[in-house]
Amino acid sequence: MKVSLFITCLSDVFFPQVGRSVVEIMNQCGVELDFPEGQTCCGQPAYNSGYQEDAKLAAKQMIKAFEHSEYIVTPSGSCASMVHHYYKEMFKGDSEWYEKAVHLADRTYELTDFLVNVLGKNDWKSKLVEKAVFHQSCHMSRALGIKEEPLKLLSQVEGLDIKELPYCQDCCGFGGTFAVKMSSISETMVDEKIKHIEATEANLLIGADMGCLMNIGGRLRRKNKNIQVLHVAEVLAKGLNK
């Protein structure tokens, strides 16, 4: 099996450790991994801001970059949902690119979805002794319907005590450009999220979308809260029995 890594903008620029963790995970699974260098932004920021033609240019570049990939795996439910749902919307009426968009969507997987539903991982052997909560991101849980897969994997991590997070599926207030355009509302939403995290007395927040982690983690730092923030890939890669 050969897998191509779709790294995403946030991992490339802000969370390189997440990309490295995905590589470690795939190596542990015995999966051959490559990195198509032609990949770029999936186009979601442009699409959500109304710049349809710019989004199409990004989508076409992504389609070309992963044209020959058997599987495409990304550590982002948000970017995966863009490829799955909105590429097809953008290219409706364009038979050539619509078919290519469908072909790309059919081969693109969010990381935990791939590990559980393609590789069938049910005996993950890593260790992390922490009391934690898991934040369900909007695009991943609603757009892709991926809810149990990350929790199933985290339940296999030795020493990890996952507490139930109240209102775990409530938006953290990031929403891409929403956090910029509606900053006061976004701030209220993330403060509410932090209140629920603190109520669990957890010292670790785990998520599967880096936009959420950047938003919540940044707010935690500004409020001087001693709560660590990790991507699910980082947790799975910690203490691997290599």
Curated annotation (Swiss-Prot):
GO terms for molecular function: oxidoreductase activity. GO terms for biological process: lactate metabolic process. Disulfide bonds: none annotated. Signal peptide: none annotated. Pfam families: CCG (PF02754). One of its GO terms (cellular component) is cytosol. Is involved in L-lactate degradation and allows cells to grow with lactate as the sole carbon source. Belongs to the LutA/YkgE family. This is Lactate utilization protein A 2. The gene is lutA2.
